[in-house]
Regions:
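Non-catalytic alpha-helical scaffolds and adjoining flexible linkers that form interface surfaces
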Residues: 8-28, 33-38, 42-179
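Short, Lys/Arg-enriched N-terminal segments with co-localized hydrophobic residues
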Residues: 1-7
Length: 179
């Protein structure tokens, strides 16, 4: 029937993997912050046993192109293609700590299906910046985290950007603009 086809329509989006959870021998549930649907949970069947699929496509912090279908309130991934991975972050424990903190914060603060394309683009840019940035001391790491949290507070309407700008020196303001 046409109603059944409508339910199983393939939808495509881009998303950054927030976390993954293995649910049985072969399947994984992943939480994704997507560009077009906000935060969603989706199941990907058979990925852990597949010899054809790239298993790293579901690793947290990776940006992927996702083809999926929605049935009721559940998403099932049909196909994923790795679009971007942040290699320099994965090689540096300090960057990994910051990156996973960012992912966890996004996961805890953003509600399911809360679409924010502008914030999604900003998140990808933040990870690009973290990937390029050399962290030379702990203070830099904490400054980045503080700026990120302030950015989230602005996005969530807790602070106005003009209020936050008064707290920064010129040097810190440059970092803040990137994050």
């Amino acid at each position: 029937t046409s109603k059944a086809k409508e339910i199983m329509k393939i939808i495509k989006t881009e998303g950054i993997i927030l976390k993954k959870k293995e649910i049985n021998e072969a399947d994984v549930i992943i939480t994704i912050f997507t560009k077009n649907f906000g935060k969603i949970d989706s199941i990907i069947h058979g990925i852990r046993k597949s010899k054809r699929r790239e298993k790293n496509v579901i690793n947290p912090m990776n940006v992927s192109e996702i083809s999926m279908y929605q049935k009721n309130s559940y998403y099932t991934i049909k196909d994923m293609e790795l679009k971007k991975t942040f290699l320099e972050i994965s090689k540096d424990i300090e960057k990994l700590e910051v990156g996973f903190y960012f992912l966890d914060t996004i996961n805890k603060i953003y509600e399911y299906n809360d679409v924010d394309e502008e914030f999604y683009d900003r998140i990808v840019n933040i990870f690009d910046y973290l990937d390029r940035k050399e962290i030379t001391n702990s203070a830099e790491k904490y400054i980045m985290v503080t700026h990120f949290l302030r950015r989230i507070m602005i996005e969530q309407g807790i602070y106005e950007e003009s209020d936050i700008m008064t707290y920064f020196s010129k040097d810190l303001l440059e970092i803040y603009k990137l994050i």
